[in-house]
Curated annotation (Swiss-Prot):
Signal peptide coordinates: none
Gene for this chain: folD
Function statement: Catalyzes the oxidation of 5,10-methylenetetrahydrofolate to 5,10-methenyltetrahydrofolate and then the hydrolysis of 5,10-methenyltetrahydrofolate to 10-formyltetrahydrofolate.
Quaternary structure and partners: Homodimer.
Protein name: Bifunctional protein FolD
Entries under Pfam families matching the protein: THF_DHG_CYH, THF_DHG_CYH_C
Length: 282
């Protein structure tokens, strides 16, 4: 019987720990403040921003919402970020992605002060991760490491396969597993003999962006499967990149969708807010 890794419960534990930490900081007259910028009214982005605001409220983190119209120019957005960079009372800045086509994402990410880069996307944050230095960690991969550790799953010495090579999940995930002394392979759309590689994995992280792509033919008996995907199927039901029902009886542990990786991403964003405020700001 597979262990169902409960991201909701584990993220709740982390938020409770952070709530106590923020309360302690407040008793010293120190405040953690996150500025969240959203351009346009993409429904999914609006939901994510709402979830981040709720998590801030729960942890005692002050949040500032900047809801900009879709026609906001790149220059206007960069000017706002620079204003927030200069504000001593703002300890973290997050720009909700994706951005409209007329705004260059990389330019926006690079404009955020690396000391306030709570998403962990700035080249300075990514560089620190790649050479093993302390710094902001990309939230989803950091959340996955916490899921594994807090579920008693050892990473050291394990054969780890990451399916997907995005800058947000795949690449930083591989680096974090390497940092934990896993033996890491990255697969992607051009990988040949994919199932031969995935069937070697003790820990398989699936972030490929295709609904129910991973079936039991790709998984060895007793593997741990982490599903990063989030989609709606033809019946409007949430599902991941893993065909959960097909795989669940073959694995030793698996994350569900929803309730697995998703809540951890927000918990680790809150963790980054507190970490950064303490390290750089207050």
């Amino acid at each position: 019987m597979a262990m169902i890794i409960d991201g909701k419960r584990i993220s709740g534990e982390i938020k409770d720990e952070l709530k106590a930490e923020v309360s302690e900081l407040k008793s010293q007259g120190k405040e953690v403040t996150l500025a969240v910028i959203q351009v346009g009214t993409d429904p999914a982005s609006t939901v994510y921003v709402g979830n981040k605001k709720k998590a801030c409220e729960y942890c005692g983190i002050r949040s500032l919402a900047y809801e900009l119209p879709l026609e906001t120019t790149e220059e206007e957005l960069l000017n706002l970020i620079n204003e927030l960079n200069d504000r001593d009372d703002v300890t973290g800045i997050l720009v909700q992605l994706p951005l409209p086509d007329h705004i260059e994402e990389n330019k926006v990410i690079k404009t955020i002060d690396p000391k306030k880069d709570v998403d962990g996307f700035h080249p300075e944050s990514v560089g620190a991760l790649s050479i093993g230095q302390a710094g902001y960690l990309s939230c989803t991969p950091a959340g996955i490491v916490q899921l594994l550790k807090r579920s008693g799953i050892e990473i050291e010495g394990k054969e780890c396969v990451v399916l997907g090579r995005s800058n947000i999940v795949g690449k930083p995930m591989a680096l974090l597993l390497l940092r934990e002394n896993g033996t890491v392979t990255i697969c992607h759309s051009k990988t040949k003999n994919l199932s031969e590689i995935t069937k070697r994995a003790d820990i398989l992280v699936v972030a490929i962006g295709k609904p129910r792509f991973l079936t039991k033919e790709y998984v060895k008996d007793g593997a741990v499967v982490i599903d990063v995907g989030m989609h709606r199927d033809e019946n409007n039901k949430l599902c991941g990149d893993v065909d959960y029902d097909d795989v669940v009886d073959k694995v030793s542990a698996i994350t569900p969708v929803p309730g697995g990786v998703g809540p951890m991403t927000i918990a680790m964003l809150m963790n980054n807010c507190v970490y950064g405020a303490k390290k750089f700001q207050i």
